[in-house]
Amino acid sequence: MATRTYNTISICSGYGGIELGLREVIPVRTVCYVEIEVSVAAVLAARMEEGYLDQAPIWTNLKTFDTEPWRGKVDILTGGFPCQPFSVAGAQLGEDDPRNLWPDTARLIRGLRPPVVFLENVPGILEYYFSTIRPELREMGYEVTEGLFSASETGAPHKRQRIFILADTDSSGSRQDREQTQLWASGSEQSSGTSGVSREGEDGEVEGKGRELDESRYVPLYPPGPGDRDGWALLLSIVPEAEPTFCRTLNGTTSGVDLRLRAIGNGVVPAVAARAFRVLSEKLKKQGNFPKL
């Protein structure tokens, strides 16, 4: 069993999906979040208030984050730096995109020197990863492994493939380190062992099972017009199930996407983060590399 709680700094935190996933694997405490989006930072603050996330300060700008006060106090750096420069949904400008925050992420890694780095991004980052990110991590003294994971592997109804990267500063490891890594990797599936990025167990789609509805509870509805806010409010107060699953955008009550949906869309599925950490820890163990925590 783990002997202590490991401190993490979360960059480009989103709603804290990576941190929630890590909790399923090892005892961690987030000591600082870095998140520039005001609406998403508000979600983080709300989740801290509700007790879902660790209470910690939120720094708003990765570019101005001072690593000096945190040096030697952080065990793991986690983050999913912006995917827009590499996503197929955008222009894929890569390293030329001003939103590319890998150089700033690398600055934090050099300044903090965390024993372990755990990162996430879209598959479109692969070329940049092999040409820039992995070589730079190795130059910093890290052993690096990576894998392709999808939400469907953990039972979600959507694929949502993501690249996860696990980097470790130590290549030998003490007995305690080896035992700790074995704990992290316990219950994980065996990795493919191939070079480069491997697809870590595409298990196929999981068939969803919806609950049966008691039709006797329902009466015919005649929905109000799109602009009739009072009418919609009355109807949904009587039959809240009538509100679309894709909330607050299709029922005429608002013209914008709910901020929670934006946070979810940019975030990490916690179960996928947990699985990725277990599998990649197992890879490092097989290679003789053990997180020095």
Positions of PLM-derived features:
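SAM cofactor-binding core of SAM-dependent methyltransferases
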Residues: 6-63
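N-terminal Rossmann-like NAD(P) cofactor-binding module of classical short-chain dehydrogenase/reductase
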Residues: 9, 76-78, 118
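Short, structured active-site "lid" loops
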Residues: 46-82, 166
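Short, hydrophobic alpha-helical segments
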Residues: 277-288
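Nucleotide phosphate-binding/pyrophosphate-handling subdomain across enzymes
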Residues: 269-272, 279
